[in-house]
Amino acid sequence: MDKLYTPNPDGYCGDEDNGQTSAWYVFSALGFYPVAPGSGQFVLGAPLFRSAKIHLENGKTVTIEAPDNSDTNRYVEDLDVDGKPYNLNYVTYDQLTSGATLKYDMGSTPNLTRGTADESKPYSFSRSADVPKVKAKKSRK
């Protein structure tokens, strides 16, 4: 994100797609993105900033804190949501619109155990267990 998107005339790579590219960038820079619209979930990633606030129309505020975030500390070690340990890999629309506080503990190496349980996974259009098996058709030869 810090190499392909810059504040220059050629700062967006590729086609802007009617604002979709910049919307992706803003969400991703905040540390979450609505991968499956309509699911009510925002998949978590690593925020670009150490601190950000989103003031919502309903008067609530979404606060994102990642005080140790840096070029070397780019991995999510742990996450607290509203002051409690949080092991899911997504937040919900309802959480955000209620004025959530996301506090990221960032580190220099990936945490390979956080968010690995099945219940931690976000909604998917095609989980491997849900994908029907397709039988190969016999060749006409």
Describe the predicted segments one by one.
Residues 1-141:
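Non-catalytic C-terminal accessory modules of carbohydrate-active enzymes
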